[in-house]
């Protein structure tokens, strides 16, 4: 099976290494030839709109390597084939608030949280949740990026 992956970073590399053990071939839509996965399969460099068309014709199934994938690219690729997970799942996971609210709604246990947009809201959240606490950005955080440990109120 040819698996298309939107993105060619370290997560795509780990996916490819596992897929090869199962006999699959990989195709990547990358930002650069230097991306970590680009040596592990046919790679299309996303530097013009025609590339997405070419990439879209060269796989049996497509996925993306992280929640930071551009939803507009997923929408273009899905015009030719299904993308798993769906773009609605991608949209949900691109914002921690949407993600946490869904988990809470489904009664799936998760750490206490409060969405904040100001210092006043942060102080209120700390009073409610307690310290120590971790302040996280709502978007674009990964591997510790966008996370701040709060140990005290000062």
Where are each of the predicted segments found?
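Active-site nucleotide/adenylate-binding loops and adjacent lid/helix of ATP-dependent enzymes
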Residues: 94-154
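ATP-binding N-terminal substructure of ATP-dependent carboxylate-amine bond-forming enzymes
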Residues: 1-94, 98, 120
């Amino acid at each position: 099976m040819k698996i298309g992956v939107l993105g060619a970073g370290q997560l795509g590399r780990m996916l490819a290494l596992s897929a090869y053990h199962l006999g699959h071939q990989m195709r990547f839509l990358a930002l650069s030839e230097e991306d970590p996965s680009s040596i592990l399969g046919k790679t299309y460099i996303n530097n013009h709109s025609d590339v997405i068309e070419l990439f879209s014709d060269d796989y049996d199934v497509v996925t993306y390597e992280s929640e930071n994938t551009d939803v507009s690219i997923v929408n273009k690729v899905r015009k030719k084939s299904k993308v798993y997970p769906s773009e609605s799942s991608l949209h949900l996971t691109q914002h921690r608030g949407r993600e946490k609210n869904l988990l809470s709604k489904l009664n799936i246990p998760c750490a206490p949280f409060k969405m904040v947009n100001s210092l006043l809201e942060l102080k209120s959240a700390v009073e409610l949740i307690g310290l120590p606490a971790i302040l996280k950005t709502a978007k674009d955080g990964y591997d510790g990026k966008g996370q701040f440990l709060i140990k005290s109120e000062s």
